[in-house]
Design a protein with these regions (language model features):
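Short linker/helix segments within small regulatory modules
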Residues: 154-158
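Conserved small/polar residues in nucleotide/adenosyl-binding loops
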Residues: 168-173
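N-terminal leader/targeting segments
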Residues: 2-5, 9
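A broadly conserved sequence feature marking short terminus-proximal activation segments
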Residues: 89-152
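Alpha-helical bundle segments that constitute or directly flank the non-heme di-iron/ferroxidase center
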Residues: 9-38, 46-60, 73-99
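Short cysteine-rich clusters marking metal-coordination/redox-active sites
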Residues: 146, 162-165
Length: 180
């Protein structure tokens, strides 16, 4: 679905704002880890707080670009993005690195590409489960773990309510998951 900014300089600005805020968020979380490791808890906390602010800014711009859909659409978009990363992006990066004399980096790009391939497969499997109503019910016995308290249940269906912490599956759909 196209957004109202399609083809405009404003759309490019929104994309750049989203990208910049997203990168800043990651950088600040990396910086927080270093500050914490060096014993600067207050500085680490400030980096993390700012990273959370940057996340909200990125979300705001991404929403303007109509980048957030329902779970089905989000799984499809995520799978497509991962496909691009492993089939085109990282392979292209690897070839360039080889041509420029960086074989170790080329190998690393390809290894990350393999991880992205796994990510795509996982998203496509989740999408299939969603489309076939097999998110909380499987055709064979599975181990289910409550994401809230860790209680384990074995069966073909996740419990609607965790018998330990009373979390409702319908209230927090992703709180119960199949372990296998």
């Amino acid at each position: 679905m196209a957004n109202k900014y399609t083809g405009t300089k404003t759309e490019k600005n929104l994309q750049e704002a989203f990208s910049g805020e997203s990168q800043a968020r990651n950088k600040y979380t990396f910086f927080a880890s270093v500050a914490k490791k060096e014993g600067y808890e207050q500085i680490a906390a400030l980096f993390l707080k700012t990273a959370d602010n940057e996340k909200e800014h990125a979300k705001m711009w991404f929403k303007e670009l109509m980048g957030i859909g329902d779970t089905k659409a989000n799984l499809g978009a995520a799978a497509d993005g991962e496909n691009y990363e492993w089939t085109d992006m990282y392979e292209g990066f690897a070839k360039t690195a080889e041509e420029e004399g960086f074989p170790e980096l080329a190998a690393k790009f390809r290894m990350v590409g393999e991880i992205e391939k796994h990510h795509e497969e996982r998203y496509r499997a989740l999408l299939k489960n969603l489309e076939t109503a097999h998110v909380f019910e499987k055709s064979e016995v599975k181990v289910w773990e409550c994401r809230n308290c860790g209680h384990i249940c074995v069966g073909v269906k996740a419990p609607e309510v965790c018998p330990v912490c009373l979390l409702y599956t319908s209230d927090a759909a992703d709180e119960a998951r199949s372990v296998d």
